[in-house]
């Protein structure tokens, strides 16, 4: 397990830090909190840590809202 930092590419803000089995692949989708992101690129990926830059992904389909019965 390696520590992975997920960052916003424009602001350098750290969105999340967590341990992963390996570095996520470029183009892979990752879930951070309740939002989904796509991996843009990885920086300084070494066997002991990895910094990953991600971009938010628009939700593809909205669930139909039904009134409570």
Regions found by a protein language model. Give the residues of each.
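Short, solvent-exposed loop/turn positions at domain surfaces
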Residues: 17-18
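Short, basic/aromatic beta-hairpin or loop at an interaction surface
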Residues: 1-14
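Glycine- and charge-enriched low-complexity intrinsically disordered segments
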Residues: 60-69
């Amino acid at each position: 397990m390696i520590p992975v930092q997920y960052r916003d590419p424009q602001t350098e803000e750290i969105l999340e830090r967590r341990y992963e089995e390996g570095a996520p692949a470029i183009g892979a989708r990752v879930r951070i909190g309740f939002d989904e992101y796509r991996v843009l690129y990885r920086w300084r990926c070494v066997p002991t840590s990895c910094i990953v830059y991600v971009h938010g992904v628009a939700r593809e389909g909205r669930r139909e809202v039904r009134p409570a019965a």
